């Protein structure tokens, strides 16, 4: 898309360079989507994780499965974002892709497959209102972080012990 910039939205490389990076196992996940290759660099991801940064991936269910299959020593929270309706999704795709009906129709066909995988995610949110969707996502993240907190785990463990004794 014309509004995307190299090094900000994506790192743009040639197809041959991308395939070379695949062969070198440089991606945590990758896919070819509508004639374009997309991937998440292991080096970039692990550098951020080693700096205790949280990472948000905007990827499809196949990319999510690739990351989950890596058995990383990091907590992964998966959130599937649904549109409020098929019609609204189509309109959003048209607006995003400069009213290119061909692209919007191709993406709607792909959506028919993608939506079947919603159960594979930890959380699901309907993006009918951007602000509400954002608040729900933050709530899911905070809930997951609380569950991972060792102090919280000790508190729950202690409480369970008191209930069974």
Where are these regions (language model features)?
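Ras-like small GTPase catalytic G-domain
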Residues: 74, 86-89, 94-116, 131-132
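Alpha-helical elements of Rossmann-like donor-binding domains used by nucleotide-donor carbohydrate transfer enzymes
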Residues: 44, 66, 110, 136-140
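ATP-dependent small-molecule kinase phosphotransfer cores
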Residues: 1-55, 61-65
């Amino acid at each position: 898309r014309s509004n995307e910039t190299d090094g900000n939205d994506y790192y743009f490389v040639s197809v041959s360079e991308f395939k070379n990076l695949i062969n070198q196992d440089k991606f945590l996940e990758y896919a070819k989507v509508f004639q374009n290759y997309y991937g998440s660099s292991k080096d970039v991801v692990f550098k951020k994780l080693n700096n205790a940064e949280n990472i948000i991936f905007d990827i499809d269910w196949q990319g999510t499965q690739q990351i989950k299959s890596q058995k990383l020593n990091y907590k992964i929270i998966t959130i599937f974002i649904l549109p409020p309706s098929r019609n609204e999704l189509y309109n959003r795709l048209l607006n995003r892709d400069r009213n290119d009906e061909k692209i919007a129709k191709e993406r709607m066909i792909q959506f028919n497959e993608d939506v079947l995988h919603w159960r594979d995610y930890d959380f699901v949110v309907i993006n009918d209102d951007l602000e509400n969707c954002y608040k729900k996502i933050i709530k899911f993240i905070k809930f997951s972080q609380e569950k991972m907190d060792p102090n919280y785990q000790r508190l729950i463990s202690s409480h369970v012990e008191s209930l069974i004794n």
